[in-house]
Amino acid sequence: MRILKPYLRSTSIQCYLCLLLNSHFLTEACIPVFILSCINAGLPKTEANWQDVISDLKIIDKIIQSLHIDATLYTESDVHPNCKVTAMKCFLLELHVISLESKNETIHQTVENIIILANSGLSSNRNITETGCKECEELEEKNIKEFLQSFVHIVQMFINTS
């Protein structure tokens, strides 16, 4: 089971930097910069890949169907675009309930993966203050199937704005 999605950073900047240093400085000065640039280019970078979140939600949906869990979860079914970060945080909190109710290791790992990916994507929106949004406890309680459908809908909102 995958936990993070590593991506390589663009190496073009490092190559241009090395060429610049090679043409203007001594070779000895360029070698450490070149080595560090190569290391930096190969380091994994975690980015929210919202398509992977949707795939993981589908995995949970398939497993849930075979387990027959009757939990109801706070679900935002009509997310306003100005409240999508708040709604996403509520969905992520409710995912823990699915993990606890199912007592299934695959679901637990998939939930953890979704949380890591989504929080990575939300990191640029952490300081955004959304006003007029419902608190998690004010949302309507719905079954897991409807919860997952609404979750996919909000993830698609993030895909459409990225």
Curated annotation (Swiss-Prot):
- Respond yes or no to whether keyword Signal is given for this record: yes
Q: Which Pfam families match?
A: IL15
What job does this protein perform?
A: Cytokine that plays a major role in the development of inflammatory and protective immune responses to microbial invaders and parasites by modulating immune cells of both the innate and adaptive immune systems. Stimulates the proliferation of natural killer cells, T-cells and B-cells and promotes the secretion of several cytokines. In monocytes, induces the production of IL8 and monocyte chemotactic protein 1/CCL2, two chemokines that attract neutrophils and monocytes respectively to sites of infection.
GO MF term list: cytokine activity; cytokine receptor binding
Prosequence residues removed at maturation: 30-48
Keywords annotated in UniProt: Cytokine, Disulfide bond, Glycoprotein, Secreted, Signal
List the transmembrane segments. Answer: none
What is this protein's record name?
A: Interleukin-15
Q: Name one GO biological process term.
A: positive regulation of phagocytosis
Span of the signal peptide = 1-29
CC terms in the record's Gene Ontology section? extracellular space
Disulfide bridge map:
83-133, 90-136
The family assignment reads:
Belongs to the IL-15/IL-21 family.
What glycosylation sites does the entry record? 104, 127
Spell out the subcellular localization from the entry: Secreted
